[in-house]
């Protein structure tokens, strides 16, 4: 579409600023001024009269008379605004809010030809979706699907989107589907969830901006467009393009669904038949367009009145357009209106009405909400609801933990804040609902109380009236001396008494005290119901109900017996009627007394309830004490169980030691039986000196003989079997013990409860018995008082009977007078009713007339208001048109002067031509004979000149006629000037302002030409910068992708490492526990062996006496054997003492080596942070290893010193023991070799146990070191993970920053594209102007001289070459920009 048809944007480098509005959901207004068309640029001075100017980005001034009008909007775009700035100011925020679940609407409003379709769609070319001047709708598609793709990249498979498009038009108040060309008229329907929708409209699913473009172009081809005098392609219908966006997000089996609608509306423009010159079908279309737009204006006016607090009916259903856009205008949507205005003076009235419409629409406030629904697994949702209920109950009971936010991780803080706010909101809602219900109930009760008070007052008035009438009648009868009454009078009197009794009953029923008591009774009953739910109260109520039933039965029997005594034969006499009325009054009194007694009982019940609550409190306190006692008892039992377990463990250890001892004794017997021992006799003793070496060898063989493996396996199996049996017995006993203890605890609790219940029941029973005795005595006293009262009532009844008999006689006379007065009263009442009916009829008629007058007055006021607006508009238009006529008059004067100057010039030229002709003719006559050839040429030239002269003569004639016509028009204009001279004085200042503005515009044109050059240079710089930014962006993308991959790999490796570390940690803990158990066992075994060694020492002391006798005989043999045994013992002791050192210096394999290798691989992938982390981790691990090694060495040295000391002490003891044993061997005792062998074995066993203990300690130290290493590794991994998370956050912020910079650069590029388009258009227009001016100049000048013509042609050629060079530059720049744009789209 060319700029001249629907509006033309111009260049601006930056988008308009988005100002924050006071109300977030108020309708925002964007005003755009349409640029002038091409035809207006070829005026007299290159300018056209503009009726408005944009003062700033938010204010606009309309040049009206006598004073200009100022309008303020959210955004005001001048003539130079680009399509990109319009999109960034209007549609960008709306599209983002639609992504967040809000409904959004954008529609363009304005007169026909003001640029609505150009703003919404763009130019009418076929490639307008990729055109640089494309409108709001295509750009909205691009941005929407860009945001969708971005969200998908962020969320992955957890979030999905569905976009559906529909396209309809409203033509002549009928709805048609543009996506289905064969569809008939569609209908609007309303749904409780969807709102207003079109039945049967086609919805196409789209997945990209290109598909949305196809849907839009397919529907746009079906739209009704026609040509008018103001617009070559005028929209003849309202078009509504709707995009439905649905997003589904899954988190832990819960699905959050958000849905929103984006309505993009292109309204048809308002038209005037005088301006557009429409007729026939076009006129009908214009009428329906104007009607729907007027309905839109009425709806907006009504919404503004409602916002200001007035009660107005909003007529949405008067037009299909307003009904369809109901939510957008005053409901659940965020709305932006683009008001397009025409700056031309001819469109002043429509421009003014458009600005007033936009100003009213700006005052409307919508209430946009997020359209969100939650679905998912029922169990998950139920668990969430249960969790929320538990938290709510805890918060209500005051048991909610205060540090719940501290215990959570920092990432859960937002959820906890949300949960706390949600709980507070729920509590506030419940509290407000309960308060509201209580207040409503109180209001109802108070209204009932007021009604009852009114009825009570009315009944009192009636009673007073009856009594006054009765007194008057009695006084009259007393004065007249009437004693007897007729039957009619008696009947009337009885009827009046009955009426009085009825009013008394009503008074009793509607008495305010009774109502108050009823309210108190109601509240007490509710309290009683709550109390009655308790078991103790239920029991008490049952007992009281039984007692009450018995008392009521006794009272009824007593009352029946009284009635039987007092019943007399009934006769239908006036006295009996009187008796019945008196009885009814007595019954009412009894009822009153009964109500008062019920009130007293209810109060008494309330006191009893207080006592019961106190008892319940005492009961609970006693229960609490019993529970505390039971808790103390359980703690004592637990301590006893622990002590018992310790005792059992010690017993098991003893049993284990005994079993080991028993199992090891057969090995000794086996060793003793398996070897031949030389028999000792007297000969052997005598020959001992010679046989000692052989016996020593035998002893060595016996000692060095190994134990057979079968015996050790049997010993181990026996120990394991015994341990298993003991463990099974222990577990069974423990289970039984637990069961018995739990049973015992339950029984003790039951016993305590039963004791407490029995004591409380006994106390309650005693108190209730005393209460019932008191109540029984009170009832007996009440019965006695009632009997006395009954007797008094009988006496009073007798007196009243006599009085009634006397009064009846008086009443018979009074009834006659009453009947006469009633007749008079009935006549008076009939007259009064007739008058009242007449007055009411008159009142209704007057009221109807008043209503009609009010309606007429309102309609007249509305008509007056509309006429006033129309009058103001017409007045403004008339003033503006007069200004335009004055301007045209001045222009015509100027043109007239120019024409006169041209005419004088032409006359001078004509005279010069005549002189030239005369000169030429004279020269021809002189040179006639000599220059025949030249004569012929001159003749030709003369003929040519004659033709030119004839042409000039014709031109002069035409100019003379035109001059006459202009003189005639001048005379008519002079007459008009005479009429307008008075007004001209007032408008001179405005003309001066306009001239100044023209001068300013001329200067701005010069500055703009200079700025165009600067902008072209800046464009080149920006292009170069943009290419650099694109390269940097690509590098950033690659770096981000690599970092994301590295982060994912690091996460996976960390998870693997954490799982492996956890498994190893568990294994190490198990090993450590096993090692500690083995160490305990070894210490126990060592203690047992020490006890055995002490026992052996005692035996040795007993046998020292025998050994001392044989010392003298075996001195030589003992010396030799001592030396041998010392050498043999020193060797194993040295080997034993050196073995821990060797073991301690064995190489250690750390657990963290595979993790360090993996971490090294991760460090190679990471760039900067990983190097630092690896260095720190290496230093830390080295230091930890050094510390652990030093600790191990210290422990080993200490252990070695201790073991050496122990071994030295043991060696000394063993040496002494061996010396003693060898001395005792001389006696020939058979037990000595076996004892020595046992001692050696015990020593070897003790040494091996010490070695195992050392190994176990070394193993424990190794495990501790490995644990420290794993802990350090975990700390390092946590630190690196935190750093990676920080790096992730930083990359995200950089990505967001890059996104915003990219959007800014894209908007700048779009503005540059539009600038190039505008520059090319202006270049074409300038070329046309140059050609036109060249033709006009050639015509005016006529090129008298060939040299002038040649110079002029050379000048034109140079200018043409310059223009061609500029055009070539601009074409190259345009191609470069298109290529960069294609590259950007490819990216």
UniProtKB/Swiss-Prot annotation:
GO terms for molecular function: ATP binding; microtubule binding; plus-end-directed microtubule motor activity. Keywords: ATP-binding, Coiled coil, Cytoplasm, Cytoskeleton, Microtubule, Motor protein, Nucleotide-binding. Residues 369-1383 form a coiled coil. It is found in: Cytoplasm; Cytoplasm, Cytoskeleton, Microtubule organizing center, Centrosome; Cytoplasm, Cytoskeleton, Spindle; Cytoplasm, Cytoskeleton, Spindle pole. Residues 1138-1387 are annotated as: Necessary for its targeting to microtubule minus ends. Strongly expressed in testis and weakly in lung (at protein level). One of its GO terms (cellular component) is centrosome. The keyword Lipoprotein does not apply. SMART domains: KISc. The keyword Ubl conjugation does not apply. ATP binds at residues 110-117. Residues 26-364 form the Kinesin motor domain. GO terms for biological process: centrosome separation; microtubule-based movement; mitotic spindle assembly. CDD domains: KISc_KLP2_like. InterPro entries: HMMR_C, KIF15/KIN-12, Kinesin_motor_CS, Kinesin_motor_dom, Kinesin_motor_dom_sf, P-loop_NTPase. Homodimer. Dimerization is required for targeting to microtubule minus ends. Found in a complex with tpx2 and microtubules. Its association with microtubules and targeting to microtubule minus ends requires tpx2. Plus-end directed kinesin-like motor enzyme involved in mitotic spindle assembly. Required for centrosome separation and maintenance of spindle bipolarity during mitosis. Belongs to the TRAFAC class myosin-kinesin ATPase superfamily. Kinesin family. KLP2 subfamily. This is Kinesin-like protein KIF15-B. The lineage of its organism: Eukaryota, Metazoa, Chordata, Craniata, Vertebrata.
């Amino acid at each position: 579409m060319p700029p001249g048809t629907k509006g033309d944007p111009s260049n601006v480098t930056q988008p308009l600023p988005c100002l924050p509005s006071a109300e977030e959901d108020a309708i925002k207004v964007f005003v755009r001024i349409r640029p002038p068309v091409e035809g207006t640029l070829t005026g007299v001075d290159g300018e056209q009269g503009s009726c408005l100017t944009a003062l700033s980005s938010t204010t606009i001034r309309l040049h009206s008379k006598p004073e200009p009008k100022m309008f303020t909007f959210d955004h005001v775009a001048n003539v130079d605004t680009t399509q990109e700035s319009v999109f960034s100011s209007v549609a960008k925020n709306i599209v983002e809010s639609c992504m967040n679940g809000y409904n959004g609407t954008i529609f363009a409003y304005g007169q026909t030809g003001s640029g609505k379709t150009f703003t919404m769609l763009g130019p009418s070319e076929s490639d307008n979706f990729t055109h640089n001047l494309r409108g709001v709708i295509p750009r909205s598609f691009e941005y929407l699907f860009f945001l969708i793709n971005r969200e998908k990249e962020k969320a992955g498979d957890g979030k999905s989107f569905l976009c559906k498009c529909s396209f309809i038009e409203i033509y002549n108040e009928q709805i048609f589907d543009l996506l289905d060309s064969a569809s008939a008229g569609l209908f609007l329907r309303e749904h409780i969830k969807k709102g207003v929708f079109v039945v049967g409209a086609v919805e196409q699913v789209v997945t990209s901006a290109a598909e949305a473009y196809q849907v839009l172009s397919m529907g746009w081809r079906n739209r009704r467009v026609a040509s008018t005098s103001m617009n070559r392609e005028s929209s003849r219908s309202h078009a509504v393009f709707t995009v439905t966006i649905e997003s589904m997000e899954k988190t832990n089996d819960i699905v959050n669904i958000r849905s929103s609608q984006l309505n993009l509306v292109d309204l048809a423009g308002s038209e005037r038949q005088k301006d557009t010159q429409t007729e026939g079908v076009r006129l009908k279309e214009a009428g329906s367009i104007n009607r729907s737009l007027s309905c839109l204006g009425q709806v907006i006016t009504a919404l503004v009145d409602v916002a200001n607090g007035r009660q107005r009916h909003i007529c949405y259903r008067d037009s299909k357009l307003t009904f369809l856009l109901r939510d957008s205008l005053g409901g659940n949507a965020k709305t932006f209106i683009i008001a397009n205005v025409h700056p031309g003076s001819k469109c002043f009235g429509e421009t003014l009405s458009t600005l007033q419409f936009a100003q009213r629409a700006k005052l409307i406030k919508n209430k946009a909400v997020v359209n969100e629904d939650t679905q998912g697994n029922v169990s998950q949702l139920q668990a969430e609801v249960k969790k929320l209920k538990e938290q709510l109950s805890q918060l209500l009971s005051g048991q909610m933990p205060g540090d719940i936010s501290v215990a959570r991780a920092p990432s859960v803080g937002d959820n906890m804040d949300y949960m706390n706010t949600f709980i507070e909101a729920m509590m506030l809602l419940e509290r407000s609902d309960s308060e509201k219900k209580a207040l409503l109930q109180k209001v109802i009760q108070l209204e009932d109380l007021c009604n009852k008070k009114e009825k009570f007052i009315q009944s009192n008035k009636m009673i007073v009236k009856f009594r006054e009438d009765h007194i008057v009648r009695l006084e009259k009868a007393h004065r007249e001396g009437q004693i007897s009454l007729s039957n009619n009078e008696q009947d009337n009197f009885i009827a009046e008494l009955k009426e009085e009794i009825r009013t008394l009953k009503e008074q009793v029923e509607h008495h305010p005290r009774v109502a108050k008591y009823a309210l108190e009774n109601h509240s007490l009953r509710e309290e009683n119901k709550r109390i009655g739910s308790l078991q103790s109260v239920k029991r008490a109520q049952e007992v009281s109900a039984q007692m009450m039933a018995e008392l009521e039965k006794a009272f009824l029997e007593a009352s029946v017996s009284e009635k039987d005594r007092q019943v007399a034969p009934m006769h239908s006499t006036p006295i009996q009627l009187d008796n019945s009325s008196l009885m009814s009054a007595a019954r009412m009194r009894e009822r009153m007394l009964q109500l008062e007694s019920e009130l007293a009982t209810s109060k008494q019940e309330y006191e009893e309830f207080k006592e019961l609550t106190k008892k319940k409190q005492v009961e609970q306190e006693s229960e609490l004490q019993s529970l505390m006692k039971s808790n103390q008892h359980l703690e004592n039992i637990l301590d006893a169980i622990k002590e018992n377990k310790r005792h059992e463990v010690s017993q098991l250890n003893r049993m284990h030691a005994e079993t080991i001892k028993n199992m090891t004794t057969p090995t000794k017997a086996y060793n003793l039986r398996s070897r031949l021992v030389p028999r000792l006799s007297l000969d052997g003793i005598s020959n001992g000196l010679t046989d000692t070496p052989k016996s020593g060898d035998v002893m060595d063989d016996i000692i060095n003989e190994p134990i057979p493996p079968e015996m050790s396996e049997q010993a181990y199996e026996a120990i394991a079997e015994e341990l298993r049996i003991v463990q099974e017995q222990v577990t069974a006993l423990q289970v039984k013990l637990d069961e018995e203890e739990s049973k015992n605890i339950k029984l003790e609790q039951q016993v305590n409860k039963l004791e407490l219940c029995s004591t409380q029941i006994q106390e309650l029973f005693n108190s209730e018995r005393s209460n019932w005795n008191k109540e029984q005595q009170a009832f007996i006293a009440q019965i006695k008082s009632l009997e006395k009262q009954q007797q008094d009532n009988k006496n009073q009844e007798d007196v009243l009977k006599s009085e009634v008999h006397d009064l009846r006689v008086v009443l018979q006379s009074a009834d006659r007078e009453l009947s006469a007065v009633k007749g008079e009263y009935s006549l008076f009442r009939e007259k009064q009713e007739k008058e009242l009916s007449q007055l009411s009829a008159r009142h209704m008629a007057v009221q109807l007339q008043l209503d009609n007058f009010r309606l007429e007055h309102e309609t007249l006021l509305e008509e007056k208001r509309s006429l006033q607006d129309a009058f103001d508009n017409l007045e403004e238009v008339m003033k503006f048109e007069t200004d335009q006529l004055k301007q045209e008059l001045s222009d015509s004067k100027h043109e007239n002067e120019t024409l006169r100057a041209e005419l004088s010039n032409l006359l001078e030229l004509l005279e010069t031509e005549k002189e030239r002709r005369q000169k030429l003719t004279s020269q021809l006559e002189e040179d006639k004979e000599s220059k025949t050839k030249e004569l012929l040429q001159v003749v030709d030239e003369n003929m040519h000149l004659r033709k030119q002269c004839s042409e000039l003569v014709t031109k002069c004639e035409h100019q003379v006629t035109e001059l006459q016509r202009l003189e005639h028009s001048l005379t008519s204009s002079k007459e008009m000037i005479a009429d307008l001279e008075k007004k001209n004085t007032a408008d001179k200042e405005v003309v001066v302002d306009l001239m100044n503005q023209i001068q300013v515009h001329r200067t701005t044109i010069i500055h703009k030409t200079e700025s165009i050059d600067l902008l072209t240079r800046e464009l080149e710089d920006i292009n170069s910068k943009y290419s650099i930014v694109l390269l940097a962006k690509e590098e950033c993308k690659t770096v981000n992708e690599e970092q994301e991959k590295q982060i994912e790999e690091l996460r996976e490796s960390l998870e693997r490492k954490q799982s492996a570390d956890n498994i190893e940690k568990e294994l190490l803990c198990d090993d450590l526990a096993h090692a500690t158990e083995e160490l305990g066992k070894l210490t126990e075994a060592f203690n047992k062996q020490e006890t055995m060694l002490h026992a052996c020492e005692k035996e040795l002391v007993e046998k020292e006496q025998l050994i001392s006798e044989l010392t003298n005989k075996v001195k030589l043999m003992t010396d030799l054997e001592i030396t041998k045994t010392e050498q043999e013992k020193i060797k194993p002791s040295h080997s034993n003492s050196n073995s821990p050192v060797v073991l301690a210096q064995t190489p250690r394999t750390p657990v963290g080596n595979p993790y360090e290798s993996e971490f090294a691989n991760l460090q190679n992938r990471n760039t900067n942070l990983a190097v630092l982390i690896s260095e720190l981790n290496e230093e830390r691990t080295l230091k930890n290893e050094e510390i652990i090694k030093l600790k191990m060495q210290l422990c080993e040295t200490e252990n070695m010193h201790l073991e050496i000391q122990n071994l030295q002490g043991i060696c000394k003891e063993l040496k002494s023991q061996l010396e003693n044993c060898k001395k005792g061997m001389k006696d020939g005792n058979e037990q000595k070799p076996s004892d020595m062998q046992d001692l050696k074995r015990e020593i070897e066993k003790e040494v091996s146990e010490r070695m195992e203990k050392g190994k176990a300690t070394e193993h424990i130290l190794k495990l501790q070191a490995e644990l420290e290493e794993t802990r350090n590794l975990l700390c390092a991994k946590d630190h690196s993970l935190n750093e990676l998370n920080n790096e992730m956050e930083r990359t995200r912020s950089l990505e967001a920053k890059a996104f915003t910079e990219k959007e800014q650069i894209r908007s700048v590029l779009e503005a540059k594209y539009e600038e190039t388009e505008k520059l090319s258009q202006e270049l074409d227009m300038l070329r046309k102007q140059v050609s036109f001016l060249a033709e006009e100049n050639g015509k005016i000048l006529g090129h008298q001289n060939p040299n002038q013509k040649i110079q002029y042609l050379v000048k034109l050629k140079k200018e043409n070459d310059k223009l061609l060079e500029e055009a070539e530059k601009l074409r190259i720049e345009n191609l470069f920009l298109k290529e960069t744009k294609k590259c950007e789209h490819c990216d």
